[in-house]
Amino acid sequence: AEFFGVSPEKIKAGFDKSRAVFGRQETFKIGDKSCTLVLIKNPVGASQALDMIKLAPYPFTLSVLLNANYADGIDTSWIWDANFESILDMDIPQAFAGGVRHSEIARRLRVTGYDEDKITEAESLEDIMALIEAQSTDHAYILATYTAMLQFREILASRHAVGKEMN
């Protein structure tokens, strides 16, 4: 930016005006919790999302929402190639598994060696919302496959936590 003569103030102003595209590091509140929704579609994307949240300098609750609809890809075996083991290096006091394949993603989290007593499976995305609201941390990251993200956003929009538009 310095090469082009753009001041730090102008860069900051640009970032302040920008909006995240839905599901792509979209931020919102659930109750008093600061939440970030990240779309995951394959092992590389999931691993990169995990690398990103690993940079958080605070404890957070992790929710992973896994669906297996046509738009997601029916085969979810890719979760075994994603680096979920990296959660062992993060300050995550609680993890929630949701979506149509909640038991599969819960199993994947258990296999990492993460304390299985800290993993809660949720039958519905509404249950995930309630779990996030009741969590002990101030922050939550929600990693979701495409249709799980759409369904979760629909619930968020009905609670006015996000807009209904899908930019």
Which residue ranges define each predicted feature?
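ATP-dependent carboxylate-amine ligase
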Residues: 2-167
